[in-house]
């Protein structure tokens, strides 16, 4: 990137031809000598691109507005002109042409694709027997089925756990309580005294 500028004299269009791979970024247009123009006069600035005969107006200059800013990328060949009685200056900077680099990359990519296609076409074609492929696929499917059947057998081999029924025996102490509550036939239906005090006991 470097500074770039030209002077366009009255009645003399300025033609610019860039080197390959470069372009101009124009950023400002300025009227040279304001005193040479009248207060009420307005002058137009034109640009032509390549071999195009039609020019495009990019702005107006006057004594009140002696300059204006632009943002134009101008390619390989262009021409600047105006209808002012004073010189006009166009400034900006020169930079690399990104579009040319892109075109080169596209060309290189297309060449690479063609080269790869040629190399692939030159390779011998592998002879593949479709029947062998089918057999290998069926073998793989058979292995999968065997795995599934073995899983089912494992599930069937696991017998369910048996739960023991609840015991009919009484809990500890319950039998003694029940036994103590029964009537003693030998004592006439009275409860047996737990104390060994003999026949004199009144309880």
From Swiss-Prot:
Composition bias, Acidic residues: 129-157
Localization of this protein: Nucleus, Nucleolus
Region (Disordered): 121-203
GO biological process, one term: seed dormancy process
Tissues expressed in: Confined to stems and flowers with young siliques.
Single GO cellular component term: nucleolus
Function as written in the Swiss-Prot or TrEMBL entry: Probably mediates the deacetylation of lysine residues lysine residues on the N-terminal part of the core histones (H2A, H2B, H3 and H4). Histone deacetylation gives a tag for epigenetic repression and plays an important role in transcriptional regulation, cell cycle progression and developmental events.
Family to which this protein belongs: Belongs to the histone deacetylase HD2 family.
Further comment found in the protein's record: HDT4 is not required for the cellular patterning in the root epidermis.
Protein name in UniProt: Histone deacetylase HDT4
Taxonomic placement: Eukaryota, Viridiplantae, Streptophyta, Embryophyta, Tracheophyta
